[in-house]
Curated annotation (Swiss-Prot):
Protein name, as recorded: Probable dual-specificity RNA methyltransferase RlmN
Binding site for [4Fe-4S] cluster: C125, C129, C132
GO cellular component, one term: cytoplasm
Keyword DNA damage: no
Classification via InterPro entries: Aldolase_TIM, Methyltransferase_A, RlmN_N, RNA_MTrfase_RlmN, rRNA_lsu_MTrfase_RlmN/Cfr, rSAM
Cytoplasm as UniProt keyword: yes
MF annotations from Gene Ontology: 4 iron, 4 sulfur cluster binding; metal ion binding; rRNA (adenine(2503)-C2-)-methyltransferase activity; rRNA binding; tRNA (adenine(37)-C2)-methyltransferase activity; tRNA binding
Function per UniProt: Specifically methylates position 2 of adenine 2503 in 23S rRNA and position 2 of adenine 37 in tRNAs.
Binding site for S-adenosyl-L-methionine: G175, E176, S207, S230, L231, H232, N306
Disulfide partners: C118-C349
Active site: E105, C349
Amino acid sequence: METTVRKQKKNLETKKTSIYSLQLHEMQDWLKEQGEPKFRAGQIFDWLYKKRVKNYEDMSNLSKGLREKLSNSFDITTLNTLVKQTSSDGTIKFLFQLYDGYSIETVLMRHEYGNSICVTTQVGCRIGCTFCASTLGGLKRNLEAGEIVAQVVEVQRALDESEERVSSLVVMGIGEPFDNYDNLMGFLRIINHEKGLHIGARHMTVSTSGIIPKIYKFAEEDLQINFAISLHAPNSELRSKLMPINRAYKLPDLMEAIKYYVNRTGRRITFEYGLFGGENDQVEHAEELAALLKGVKCHVNLIPVNYVPERDYVRTPREQIFLFEKTLKDRGVNVTIRREQGHDIDAACGQLRAKERKEETR
């Protein structure tokens, strides 16, 4: 009987490109190289994203020869569900195992307007935010575009049982999306495409801790995707304490990049502001935040801190949260308090992590 370690070694040695990593035009190019008509790409995408098959044998309108070529060239990435937890509020957290034994977490959130999925872009994270569980083990590796796509496909398969669909997504899971920029953009284009899962660009949100060069690059992209910044502090000194990345990408420079993005795209930006008891949640912090954001087309999302055992932060009292919100509103800032989801299964903001570690290969 094969051990887990041996299976992982075998997977690493035989791994092929994920077919989920290919955009439609890339599939068409590959088909042309194989002497196949490009319209087959649409048929293949239909099998992958509409029928959501798990093997090539099921693609019955393709020739046996083409199915064999596909099988020899690409894997249909499947994620092994290690754990599936359901919260009292209906939120579902999936712990998925990857081909090399690493694991990631993906969250399905229920809203009145539909089902939203929170996807992961990296195994671990290098950013080192002092309040977040995702960064505790450091960064292991980037996910391929196909591995990010596969998260959405797997969750959609789970929803197929109740004839529901994923209607929106947020890229706010484990990892810094802009540290995996090319795979992130490939994923977004595949998911957005009408031949893919066809989730509208305006129903997708990407969040970053503030990788400034990539913010400028993102401003030039042709997808009208919602954009969020993990801010969490109204000044550089406090932000550097909470988010070490601020030492590399200073707050004044970050604000310049944000203003460029807003002016270039005409789109409103969202600032995520976690409230940490006694750290960044006082009236003076709210006043300073309002001054920082003055003149910026934006929305502030206040996030009460979620419990992480290895971190020392405590939740801001409810009355203080409302006072912080009121202080911002009184100064003309568009602000809401995020509805908490999945807290009881560690699926809320800042709580995601890979709880199953990769076994050492020998």
